[in-house]
Amino acid sequence: MAKGKKAVEITETVLRDAHQSLIATRMTTEQILPIVEKLDNIGYHSLEAWGGATFDACLRFLNEDPWERLRKIKDRAKKTPIQMLFRGQNILGYRHYADDIVEYFVQKSIANGVDILRIFDALNDVRNLECAIKACKKEKGHVQATVCYTTSEFHTNEKFVKMAKQLEEMGADSI
């Protein structure tokens, strides 16, 4: 690669998004585990295996411990960082949570095997990312801050670039 150029890094999302989008996040941990080592050997930048609806689905529909799932995946992925999708101030839920709850959840996520938090706010309100970014940095995790793309008169390239720069200033390791 030419000097000064950055490589494109690929995150595999099949362990979270594929079954979240296709079958309402109903894959059990036992269905997921057999493929983890194969995915780990491919050379991805990260495996997004947790977050989004996985936590809720484990508890409500699969009768599984989501923390145990995370630890089992991490145990099998020896080479590839584990990534999660984190809804900013909403954590993995459907409402805002207090800062101390966000901080504690981030701390426990990293302690149980998450290396990279892909943090987003569906409305692109960076204030809803601030606490999670600070907590992730405090725990030495990788902050992948997210800009949600859509089209409208308000959503311009300039606004997306401005937001990306704000996220960089807030401590994002990647966008």
What annotation goes with each model-predicted range?
Residues 1-2:
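Charged, compositionally biased N-terminal leader segments and the immediate start
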Residues 5-10, 24-54, 59-81, 90-175:
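Alpha/beta enzyme core
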Residues 9-17:
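N-terminal pre-triad scaffold of radical SAM enzymes
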Residues 16-20, 25:
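Acidic, glycine/proline-rich low-complexity segments that act as flexible tails and inter-domain linkers
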